[in-house]
C-alpha cells in the first residue's frame, strides 16, 4: 500500500486576496453600468414619427424627441417641410407635458393632441403662434408648444407690373368714338342768287328738253316699215323723214 498524500491547504491570506479581487471587479462593472445609464438619461430618445400634408399643400415629416424616463425636461417635435414651390423648411416645437395637470403620466396623449393641431395649420413652419393644448383645463406656463425659430421662404424675383387688359366694352367705345370717325363734308347747293350754300340734299339734275328725242330716227324707221311698201320704199322714206323733220 502506498502512503497517503498530504492535502494542500490554502492560507487565510490567499483567501483574502481572492475575495478582494472579486469585489473590485464587481464594483467596476456596476460603475460602468451606472455611467451608461446616466448618458442615456441625458440624451432624448427618438419617439414616433410620421408624415402629413397641410391645407396649403406643405408636405411635412415629423419626429418626436422625448427625454428618457425619470428626467422631466420636456420634449421636442422636429419638423421638415417642403413648400409647393420646392423650398425646404426646418423647424422644431418644444413643450413640457409634465406642466399640464390633465396629462399627468399620459405624455403620448399630450403629443397626439398637439400633433393634430399642427396638421390643421396651413404653414406649420411659418406660423409663429404657439400651439395650446386643449386637454389642459387651466393654461399653465410652459404647457404650450413653442417654435424657437421660424424660417422664412426664399425671396422671389420681382415681376414687372403687368398692364391691365382693356375690357371689350372700353375697346368698342374707343373704336366708335366720334373723334376717330372721318368728318363728312357738307354738300354745296347753288342758290338762286348765284352763291353756294351748304346742304345735306344732293343737287337735282335738270330735266331733259321736251323737243329732244334721242330715239327719233328709230321711230321714223318704224313708220316707214309700217306704211310704205317695198316698191315705193325709198320715196316714202323720204317723205316720212321730211315730215318728221
UniProtKB/Swiss-Prot annotation:
Origin superkingdom: Eukaryota
Major localization listed first in the record, in broad terms: secreted
Keyword Signal: yes
Alphabetical GO biological process terms: adult behavior; positive regulation of ERK1 and ERK2 cascade; positive regulation of fibroblast growth factor receptor signaling pathway; positive regulation of nervous system process; positive regulation of vascular permeability
Residue ranges, compositional bias (Low complexity): 170-180
S-S pairs: 60-81, 91-125, 228-236
Subcellular localization, as worded in the UniProt entry: Secreted
Stretch forming the signal peptide: 1-28
GO cellular component: extracellular region
Phenotype on disruption: Mutants display a range of anxiety-related behaviors including reduced time spent in the central area of the open-field arena, reduced activity in lit areas of a light/dark transition test and prolonged latency to feeding in a novelty induced hypophagia test which assesses the drive to drink a sweetened milk solution.
Region feature (Disordered): 33-52, 136-216
Residue runs in coiled coils: none
PANTHER family: FGF BINDING PROTEIN-RELATED (PTHR15258), FIBROBLAST GROWTH FACTOR-BINDING PROTEIN 3 (PTHR15258:SF3)
Quaternary structure note: Interacts with FGF2.
Functional note: Heparin-binding protein which binds to FGF2, prevents binding of FGF2 to heparin and probably inhibits immobilization of FGF2 on extracellular matrix glycosaminoglycans, allowing its release and subsequent activation of FGFR signaling which leads to increased vascular permeability.
Protein name: Fibroblast growth factor-binding protein 3
Organism this protein belongs to: Mus musculus
